[in-house]
Amino acid sequence: KMYWGDLHNHCNITYGHGDMRDAFEAAKGQLDFVSVTPHAMWPDIPGADDPRLKWVIDYHTGAFKRLREGGYEKYVKMTNEYNKEGEFLTFVGYEAHSMEHGDHVALNYDLDAPLVECTSIEDWKQKAKGHKVFITPHHMGYQGGYRGYNWKCFTEGDITPFVEMYSRHGLAESDQGDYPYLHDMGPRQWEGTIQYGLELG
């Protein structure tokens, strides 16, 4: 049997659009599983010395603060509320940005999974060892060093069993194919594709 789901959906609990309950309701009406995914951290956020970027930093860090001041507990509670074994599965997850490693999403098997603080994506993966969690790269095709995926840091195994090729950002698997990236982080690049990663071994 084939199952359909969305492992990386956003809402306005941090920065995104739409109410969290609406996100779960929409998913429940058409999917078998979902993770509504708050943005949780950006350990290497740039621009602290550039006053032009203060609004960007405040936008992100303000959302992270809201998540830690009750938002995460509300999110976990609603994720559990919508989880119906055998009917509709929900997963607790969250996203971390990284200039060096690229953005990643955590998907937890544990419906009461805590928000794990980290200093980098690699630190996050180390802290996740021994837990039932996937940490997978997101929008891989952006420029390396600016939140595009860094294949040199790929760790194959239980923690990263898959990578994301398509998202709202567009198609990551080609720098010339359909669905170009829509965000302001630049065009796609070949070095973010799965084929490039496979060629590295």
Where are these regions (language model features)?
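Extended, charged catalytic domains and RNA/DNA-binding interfaces, predominantly
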Residues: 1-201
